[in-house]
Curated annotation (Swiss-Prot):
Keywords: Disulfide bond, Erythrocyte maturation, Hormone, Secreted, Signal. PANTHER family: ERYTHROPOIETIN. The gene is epo. This is Erythropoietin. One of its GO terms (molecular function) is erythropoietin receptor binding. It is found in: Secreted. Its main location: secreted. It comes from Epinephelus coioides (Orange-spotted grouper). InterPro entries: 4_helix_cytokine-like_core, EPO_TPO, Erythroptn. Disulfide bonds join C32-C180, C54-C58. Belongs to the EPO/TPO family. The keyword Secreted applies. It holds the Pfam family EPO_TPO. Erythropoietin is the principal hormone involved in the regulation of erythrocyte differentiation and the maintenance of a physiological level of circulating erythrocyte mass. Residues 1-22 form the signal peptide.
Amino acid sequence: MLQKRGRGLLVLLLMLLEWTRPGLLSPLRPICDLRVLNHFIKEARDAEVAMKSCTEGCSLSESVTVPQTRVDFDVWEKKNGLEQAQEVQSGLWLLQQALNLLRTSVTNTALHSHIDNSIRNLLSINAVLRSLNIQEYTPPASTVALEGTWRVSSATDLLQVHVNFLRGKVRLLLLDAQACQQDVS
């Protein structure tokens, strides 16, 4: 038994030494692990599916402003990191405002947990951005001044925008974040 335990500790030690050996890529910071974002995307899709199957008490009370989700890669790559971060943060803020309105509009209680989850996930993404030293976003006094937005009037459209925004611009920002780049030690 002692030999088994000793071998296990030796294997663990060798794995740690191999992992931290100079000259190899350093492991990603946990905050940069895209599996977290993938989980948020899955939950956003679940909310969208639940909304599509809803027949009663699941509509928006008014149309809402949401971010554009289409990414022109030539334009995106010409933007500096601060501009990209501001675009993502303004989109997250718009989605949070829209989801808060949806939460108060929807009377179907089965959807409340999906909407609450989506709002919590947006707050978590904002916390991730802060931990990556991305400057805090200051929302505008009015959404009229925001570029790259449009309006949706259905809850399903809102949740589809939510999914696509996470899959697109949020993912791109996290992939390109300086703190998430793997450096050779």
